[in-house]
């Protein structure tokens, strides 16, 4: 005789599937425990504003919206998926007043006071460069600056062309659109550009900065979207893409890498030691030893790329240590990226700024300039022996975004976080090149 009180098998399966559903690797009941804890903290306004409280809220918020972003149709394919969803939601939570001041302070302390972003980028640069074949690395660095220059040329040509369509003079297009977009972001681009503008022309730096940052904000959005599109193009036309590898190895003969022995936690820890030590040396060089070259300040991340590259070329690092640094880099890029994106949304994204900048002319001009940067870098990269997709992303889009945080947004949108070292060359050394160009262009306006 059938027991009528027994629930159907399909109902049991549904409950089992729900309980087995995982958010950031956690079963739903376990994540629910974390979320309820965060909500209690929110409603009682009781959150430690140190790194513990900051990481708690960043992990819990990043996990749920990361899962939504990677599953949302269209958004996950064309807009950038989980990382973009996370930083947009986090920015909205600040804009709408959903986050309390304590929550904002906790996240800001992680991002700004503890400078988690610097640690994240330093680890990724070290792992990315040490994992590259030494001769291949030398070739890529030598050919990369010309590729950046081609990206700037492409952006300038397309920018001038669309400017003429809208009746905007060439000098104004270069000054207010092309240079801010290609200038390496906010702190390393828009801010020093406004200072150069003021010192050369005598005009208001505030007026220039407010326009430049608005255009840069729009361009950053297009850079993220185009990164996702380039990833799709690369998958459909595989000859255009190295799937995360910049150099076309077929065009360059390299020796085999040394075989790697067993990797322990100690080699991974050494990877962290090297990341922080190379960052420290780069910081000392940038701030005290060589604060500028030819009047142009070189950012410490640009120095770090060169220092880690020299360390790789020196042969001091065993294959096991290199593999340990790569393992640490993979952990940061795969397990902590969603956490970081909450901080990017809270600390480095101003939705009001984006809203204010959205006019038809600004949107069209910014989009065309970014397309020019992509095409110029792709062509230049191909001529230098690089894959067009990877060179377009690093030397094109990572020049046209908003610097360090923009690099992470762009690379995460196209699943190429291992290219962070080249992205940093674009944002830092490339940004320095743009500052030199700006001083010449602004001088011609007088």
Swiss-Prot record:
This is Citrate/sodium symporter. GO terms for molecular function: metal ion binding; organic anion transmembrane transporter activity; symporter activity. It comes from the Bacteria. Homodimer. The chain crosses the membrane at residues 28-44, 51-71, 81-95, 116-130, 137-166, 213-233, 265-287, 300-315, 328-351, 360-381, 417-438. It is a multi-pass membrane protein. Na(+) binds at residues 181, 183, 399, 401. Changing residue 317 to S: Retains 79% of specific activity, response to various thiol reagents is not affected. Allows the cell to use citrate as sole carbon and energy source in anaerobic conditions. It catalyses: citrate(out) + 2 Na(+)(out) = citrate(in) + 2 Na(+)(in). Belongs to the 2-hydroxycarboxylate transporter (2-HCT) (TC 2.A.24) family. Citrate binds at residues 186-187, 402, 404-405, 428.
